[in-house]
Each structure stands twice: as C-alpha cells, then as structure tokens.
C-alpha cells in the first residue's frame, strides 16, 4: 500500500500528511506454522516486524512477534507473545505486547510514547440451551499517564423465534472507576433484513 499518513485521526476529515508505504506478507511454511513479515516506511520513521503463528495439535495456537523501529527518537523494539485454545464450546487465551520507550508505529502521534505493555486474558463459553458467555481482562501500562485496567463480560442468547438479546458490562478499575452497561435486542424483520 502506498498513500499518505492521516493527521488528527478522529477529529479532522480529509487531513493527510507524510507519504508512506506499508506492506505485509504472510506465508504458510508448514501445515502448523505461518510466518509474517510487515513493514512501514515514512520519510523519518521506519518499522519492520516478524511474526509467527504455530498450531500445537491438541494444545492450542501459539503466536509471537518481534518488531524494531527507527525514528527521531532512536531505535525502538517491541515483542509480543500469545496463546489461545478453542473448541466448540470453550475458549480461552492470553496475549501481551511489551515495547521499548523509543518504539514507534503508524497511528502514533510524534510526541506519543509507546505503552510499556498491553496485556489481555479472555475466556468464553458457548452452550446449546443457555447462550454464550465471555469475560475479558485488559491492562495497558503507560509511561506518561495512568494505567488502564478494564474488566468486561458479555452474555448473548436466542429468544426462540422472536430474536436475540445481548448484554455486556465493562468496568474501568483505574482512575475514576466507571461502569458501562449495554443491552441490545435484534429481530428478523424478513428473509433478508434484521
């Protein structure tokens, strides 16, 4: 991909700046292992990364990544590790990314510091008669502001032929603790619309 970096994303529209080139290549090297190469190139910022996903039969999926960047801040590094297991009714996983202070990538502001780490754990359960449940824990550790610690859970089920309902709750445990609830209902209006 070749284009221009977006400026003030989320606040300005049609505001583009530096030219950039981004590329990714993923290749299945064996039946169990897939490798990936990713690069981001701007005039004063370059980032290259390697990643891999390995299927461990009867165990789960293990993933790992390493990236290095070069910019006005210097040379920065990032490493990521993850594991997930999933079957028809139960799933769980953990993942983390640890970055050096000088690491940069697309989407970061020039004055922004990379988080020390972003770690997540999740669990999910799908039942035939009682719907599906999930829970997630997220911890984002920053260098220049307070950490984010978030716990969330959700439930979804079908209500006969009437429709489906989903509920979720998210609790922010750091800073000004807040709780967010959501409730959604959807029903089929016809053969092709919902």
Please give the residue ranges for each predicted region:
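Flexible, glycine-rich linker and terminal segments associated
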Residues: 1-5, 40, 55, 59-194
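Conserved, compact domain cores that house catalytic/ligand-binding motifs in diverse enzymes
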Residues: 2-70
């Amino acid at each position: 991909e070749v284009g221009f970096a977006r400026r003030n994303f989320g606040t300005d529209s049609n505001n583009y700046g530096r030219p950039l080139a981004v590329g990714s290549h993923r290749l299945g090297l064996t039946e169990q292992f897939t490798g990936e190469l990713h690069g981001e190139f701007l005039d004063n910022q370059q980032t290259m990364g390697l990643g891999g996903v390995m299927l461990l039969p009867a165990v789960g999926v293990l993933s790992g990544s390493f990236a290095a960047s070069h910019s006005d801040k210097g040379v920065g590094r990032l490493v990521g590790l993850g594991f997930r297991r999933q079957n028809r009714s139960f799933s769980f996983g953990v993942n983390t990314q640890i970055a050096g202070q000088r690491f940069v990538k697309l989407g970061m502001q020039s004055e922004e510091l990379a988080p020390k780490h972003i770690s997540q754990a999740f669990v999910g359960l799908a039942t035939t008669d009682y719907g599906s449940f999930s829970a997630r824990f997220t911890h984002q550790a920053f260098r220049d502001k307070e950490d984010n610690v978030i716990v969330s859970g959700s439930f979804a089920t079908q209500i006969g032929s009437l429709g489906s309902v989903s509920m979720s709750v998210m609790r922010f445990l750091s800073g000004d603790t807040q709780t967010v609830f959501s409730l959604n209902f959807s029903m089929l209006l016809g053969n092709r619309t919902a």
